[in-house]
Amino acid sequence: MSKVLIIGCGGVASVAIHKCCQVPEVFTEICIASRTKAKCDKLAAELAPKTTTKITTAQVDADKTEEVIALIKAYQPDLVMNIALPYQDLTIMDACLACGVNYMDTANYEPENTDDPEWRAVYEKRCKEAGFSAYFDYSWQWAYSKKFEEAGLTALLGSGFDPGVTQAYCAYAKKHEFDTIDTIDILDCNGGDHGYAFATNFNPEINLREVSAPGSYWENGHWVEIPAMSIKREYTFDQVGQKDMYLLHHEEIESLAKNIPEAKRIRFFMTFGQSYLDHMRCLEDVGMLSTTPVNFNGQEIVPIQFLKALLPDPASLGPRTKGKTNIGCIFTGKKDGKEKTYYIYNVCDHQECYQEVGSQAISYTTGVPAMCGALMLLTGKWTTKGVHTVEEFDPDPYLEALDQYGLPRSESHNPALVD
């Protein structure tokens, strides 16, 4: 029996909230909080007849730590689920520390304003020292580890699919399939079609910043950075077919390099259609992906935020998206002295997700793991204090929960490898 404060009411949060309400014996009470309370009220009214979970709602500006603290003190939750924006990770972590409450999120911190001088100085130092230039990294949140540990609290970082489930797949492979892991390739394939010439399947601002950044991968103990979208491979995905995929920088590479240090190479690939790439490159060329404010008719606007307002809301894509996703990890390594390969992945159907929770599969594959991560903390399956990523915990109960609540795994012991 637990009380959970869920901050966020977008596409991913909606899925996570639906799934929490399917486990009322654990999620006894939830409070849905967002900047726009009307969205929370609408979702609560939709779910109330379908669950015995007690649902309340609240308004909060998660950019303001004092507002989050006031809400936590008023609601007294056992856990805060941050399913808002990664810009707000640190303010919510500060509030959890101030109130003595466990924390979890689905994506690591990145700043909204990448021109902020204080942040920029730290960022440029990290670029030189670490060797990759993506705006997002774990260092800001890892810096909280001692504070959470001393407070007797747990902060679970990145319990989505990638990051999240992909790291659990790595922990599972290390625990059950390999003595040593040599290489990890994380493959994220979306074979869905929403019918638009251009749209993003999750927050456009976050998505386009991620995809337009230089790619990077971990090899032989250091980062290798490449121009954005410059490494392309083809792969045939189960139940989807052959797709073009591109090497990206992705946050779980950073934590996996730390926690599976014997891995000689770790890469992340994501599929994209040609229409998406053509539109993205055009928008980048004309400055629409910029985070630097510009003056327009006497008013400052951020180009990428203006673009977000013009694009379809990812939460609206559910009814029109058809096809499947396939996300997983391919490993090479050794077991009992012998070379071995292994592939563990999930296939998810967009229309089945929509029929269950009114969402497309991209939000579903992030929202379900968010609920399952919360489940691990609330039921005492994961109890390590401090700030931790998913692969640092026992993967077995987490993957069993994913199997049960909508994201079952598949395996291959003879997969095609990525060159």
Positions of predicted regions on the chain:
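N-terminal Rossmann-like NAD(P) cofactor-binding module of classical short-chain dehydrogenase/reductase
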Residues: 72, 78-81, 103-105
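Glycine-/Pro-rich loop/turn segments that contact NAD(P) or position catalytic residues
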Residues: 86-89, 93-202
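Conserved Rossmann-fold cofactor-binding substructure of NAD(P)-dependent oxidoreductases
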Residues: 61-77, 88
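C-terminal catalytic/substrate-binding lobe primarily of soluble NAD(P)-dependent oxidoreductases
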Residues: 175-419
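Glycine-rich Rossmann-fold phosphate-binding loop(s) that bind the pyrophosphate
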Residues: 9-10
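N-terminal Rossmann-fold NAD(P) dinucleotide-binding loop
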Residues: 13-14
